[in-house]
Amino acid sequence: MGGVGEPGGGPGPREGPAPLGAPLPIFRWEQIRQHDLPGDKWLVIERRVYDISRWAQRHPGGSRLIGHHGAEDATDAFHAFHQDLHFVRKFLKPLLIGELAPEEPSQDGAQNAQLIEDFRALRQAAEDMKLFEADTTFFALLLGHILAMELLAWLIIYLLGPGWVSSILAALILAISQAQCWCLQHDLGHASIFTKSRWNHVAQQFVMGQLKGFSAHWWNFRHFQHHAKPNIFHKDPDVTVAPVFLLGESSVEYGKKKRRYLPYNHQHLYFFLIGPPLLTLVNFEVENLAYMLVCMQWTDLLWAASFYSRFFLSYSPFYGATGTLLLFVAVRVLESHWFVWITQMNHIPKEIGHEKHRDWASSQLAATCNVEPSLFIDWFSGHLNFQIEHHLFPTMPRHNYRRVAPLVKAFCAKHGLHYEVKPFLTALVDIIGSLKKSGDIWLDAYLHQ
């Protein structure tokens, strides 16, 4: 019999893919856990062990995204992020170095094997119901109503002139259009519209670049990490916001270390000054431009430039350069309010902390909640009120969330997982309550621990 990590044996060091036709080495979880370093990453997919150390930089979703699953069973993440599994498995073949020992469980640690099995059955049921197939008419109408709002805003200024009333009305319409662009490019980024990933990516570059002035690659870089590890510090960019705001476990950590860069016990108040008004206008604009320049995303930069050129050419004849800039700022501030409240109502009040190595379904449910649906809320939020379903199945077209929701509820009830649904206004208020609670925890730890 071979030793551990050898054909027929257990763990031992190995570099490079398994020789063609040779028996696969077998590994145990205790060995796999050792390979979660920046230059040494293994992961497990469908009980097979892959060494992604060198290939991670070539991963289309980015090295950080795939690296977040280092030394873990990434089977469900693999299925969640990819449409054409037959195609992407071709990239895995050269990375294969072995498989789990027969006596090793498919899941790592104390994860619930039955829960994982039932979730995979749930996904299969959704596939059998064709819930991953998009209604292209639905998305064509979404794009059409975005373009119609862009045209309507311009016609208001063209016909009524650049007065206060017409300018405010145009800014509101443009802000709604920009908000709906966020939703549509989000759908495209998850490859949930077209059957070919390439078509989704090209369409996303148009919507994100020409209609919004941002980089599609920048968005995907941030957003896919959020989906992989929601509400996990240093893995989810959306909650790695210290030292400006303290969320979850960071409140106690900062308090114990006597860190007081800002009056965090008042963060629920200064949130209104620097959160909703400035996120897209300042934070996103700067971060987005830096990403395009540092990562040399020149195509995205050209798309973004086309947005600014169109916007200023469209409105400068009425407002001049300064007035057009003020209109742009007004639109960004308005859409920023939408973005912060709508995207954070499902996450900020939930559990936020360090990596706990949960299974896919449990990790998503711990970090998300839903908001009660209605035709208006579904449209206004881009169906992000179905955040649980979206996080469990990122590539599912959003018009099918209502259909899969009963199956998800039954799954949660069976396994004692909290399927939380809130009224819309309650979800918004809970953001402030969560910030206040975190600030109070920080103050108590700062003063008494």
Curated annotation (Swiss-Prot):
Residues 1-13 have a biased composition (Gly residues). The keyword Lipid metabolism applies. The lineage of its organism: Eukaryota, Metazoa, Chordata, Craniata, Vertebrata. It is found in: Endoplasmic reticulum membrane. It catalyses: an N-acylsphing-4-enine + 2 Fe(II)-[cytochrome b5] + O2 + 2 H(+) = an N-acyl-sphinga-4E,14Z-dienine + 2 Fe(III)-[cytochrome b5] + 2 H2O; N-(hexanoyl)sphing-4-enine + 2 Fe(II)-[cytochrome b5] + O2 + 2 H(+) = N-hexanoyl-sphinga-4E,14Z-dienine + 2 Fe(III)-[cytochrome b5] + 2 H2O; sphing-4-enine + 2 Fe(II)-[cytochrome b5] + O2 + 2 H(+) = sphinga-4E,14Z-dienine + 2 Fe(III)-[cytochrome b5] + 2 H2O; (11E)-octadecenoyl-CoA + 2 Fe(II)-[cytochrome b5] + O2 + 2 H(+) = (11E,13Z)-octadecadienoyl-CoA + 2 Fe(III)-[cytochrome b5] + 2 H2O. This is Fatty acid desaturase 3. Pathway: Lipid metabolism; polyunsaturated fatty acid biosynthesis; Lipid metabolism; sphingolipid metabolism. Two potential isoforms are detected in various tissues. A 75 kDa isoform is expressed in lung. A 37 kDa isoform is expressed in lung, liver and kidney. Keywords: Electron transport, Endoplasmic reticulum, Fatty acid biosynthesis, Fatty acid metabolism, Lipid biosynthesis, Lipid metabolism, Membrane, Oxidoreductase, Transmembrane, Transmembrane helix, Transport. GO terms for biological process: gene expression; sphingolipid metabolic process; unsaturated fatty acid biosynthetic process. A motif (Histidine box-2) lies at residues 223-227. A motif (Histidine box-1) lies at residues 186-190. It comes from Mus musculus (Mouse). Residues 1-134, 185-268, 332-449 are cytoplasmic.
